[in-house]
Amino acid sequence: MAKEGVEKAEETEQMIEKEAGKEPAEGGGGDGSHRLGDAQEMRAVVLAGFGGLNKLRLFRKAMPEPQDGELKIRVKACGLNFIDLMVRQGNIDNPPKTPLVPGFECSGIVEALGDSVKGYEIGDRVMAFVNYNAWAEVVCTPVEFVYKIPDDMSFSEAAAFPMNFVTAYVMLFEVANLREGMSVLVHSAGGGVGQAVAQLCSTVPNVTVFGTASTFKHEAIKDSVTHLFDRNADYVQEVKRISAEGVDIVLDCLCGDNTGKGLSLLKPLGTYILYGSSNMVTGETKSFFSFAKSWWQVEKVNPIKLYEENKVIAGFSLLNLLFKQGRAGLIRGVVEKLIGLYNQKKIKPVVDSLWALEEVKEAMQRIHDRGNIGKLILDVEKTPTPLMANDSTETSEAGEEEEDHEGDSENKERMPFIQ
């Protein structure tokens, strides 16, 4: 998307490919390092190929320049989302070619303007959606995906804002038409979207929020939802014990057998929305068995049954809405409403933790283990913390040590920086 010098781009591609194959690149320095022009290079997290954490590298890469209609942003912080794990595994429809720079959202300072860009100036503080390439020191993205941020919003908050709050708002108000007195069930209530859903529900009178989350998160998030259940419990019976008719809205990021459970909980005229499929991610790499099992467990929906029971089933993908279906204008209106709520102190992004670019492996492992409460942020200017001796221990979701997998020995080391 952004224009780069052909020679520099080719050199960077060779660096990535040779490093992934453990071969020294031609023309490197005598110490084995790889250099681009210091004045026009940047650091970027690069996914060399689909698979485990060992596919991630930190490279010096040619800096992009804005094309017509684009802004160049000096990145301060980037958001890390569950979709980034699925991209790393290649566990998405029509995955892009590797090598690539992951990431879909960031915040920072406008550094340059492409031709025909209006409404922005160099030095503006902004947050943005990016169609990949966000995990870098500099990004270029079309102006329609860029939004100015309030003066009192930190860059880490701004990086935690777009994906989570826009997703939550569109599902609640554009798709499900949330109104006073309704009830909502949200899975992964302790995650970034889950916390955004809880906060937005609090802006509507008398909304009851049912949430599922890992038990260790309950103390931290108990005040944000009305009723909280363990993610492994029989939440269907728990919800019906409290509300015999069920709920008006189900927000499902899990998929699998939760689809049927969610539909069974809907009241007449209720809406079930699928916006993720995290149950398909079990191991560090893509698993055909996990994918097949999760897909097999999805209840086959009969339209006649929906008609008879007066139920609505929907899906939502923010990235597809933005980058494939051309609804940037709709999303800009949503962002403006959300910033208004932020300025009124009614919503505030929940940031779980900040990670250096060098620590992206550890950050991804934390979100894979469902250990986060709120959003994980890559802080571009953060210095990586020293590795602890026991940081390399890998555990399952049940807290038990997992067996070593092929390539795991490399995953237990800090991601190397390839100059």
Swiss-Prot record:
Basic and acidic residues bias (residue ranges): 1-25, 408-419
Annotated Acidic residues bias: 397-407
EC assignment: 1.-.-.-
Tissue: Detected in skin fibroblasts.
Residues carrying Phosphoserine: S392, S396
Class of enzymatic activity (EC top level): oxidoreductase
Gene Ontology terms for molecular function: oxidoreductase activity; zinc ion binding
Chain segments carrying region Disordered: 1-36, 384-419
SUPFAM superfamilies: GroES-like, NAD(P)-binding Rossmann-fold domains
Pfam families: ADH_N (PF08240), ADH_zinc_N_2 (PF13602)
Keywords for this protein: Oxidoreductase, Phosphoprotein
Residues the record lists as Phosphothreonine modifications: T393, T395
Protein family membership: Belongs to the zinc-containing alcohol dehydrogenase family. Quinone oxidoreductase subfamily.
Protein name: Synaptic vesicle membrane protein VAT-1 homolog-like
Species annotation: Homo sapiens (Human)
Encoding gene, per UniProt annotation: VAT1L
